[in-house]
């Protein structure tokens, strides 16, 4: 691993919620809100973007845990920051 990664490092991703980010759950959920699985996807995406500059070409990263907390609903076309 390349040097430089420090505790507390941050990166942000801002995007608009799209319809593909809604819950699908075999038709059981119909609300037009940002889904938990999409939130985890975006959390994993920003985590990888933060780590990528420090990985050597032969290295890979594996997550150990994800803690998700919805602070408020976000509808389709809402701006979200992860």
PLM feature segments, named:
Residues 37-39:
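A short mixed-secondary-structure module that forms the rim of ligand-binding clefts
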Residues 1-35:
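Catalytic strand-loop segment that frames the active site of acyl-thioester-processing enzymes
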Residues 47-81:
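Hydrophobic beta-strand-centered segment that forms part of the acyl-chain substrate-binding groove
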């Amino acid at each position: 691993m390349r040097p430089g990664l420090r505790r507390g490092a941050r990166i942000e991703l801002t995007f608009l919620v799209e319809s593909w980010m809604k819950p699908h759950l075999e038709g059981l959920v119909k609300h037009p809100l940002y889904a938990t699985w999409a939130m985890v996807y975006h959390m994993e995406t920003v985590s990888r973007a933060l780590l990528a500059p420090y990985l050597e070409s032969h290295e890979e990263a594996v997550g150990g845990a994800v803690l998700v907390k919805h602070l408020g609903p976000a509808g389709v076309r809402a701006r979200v920051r992860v």
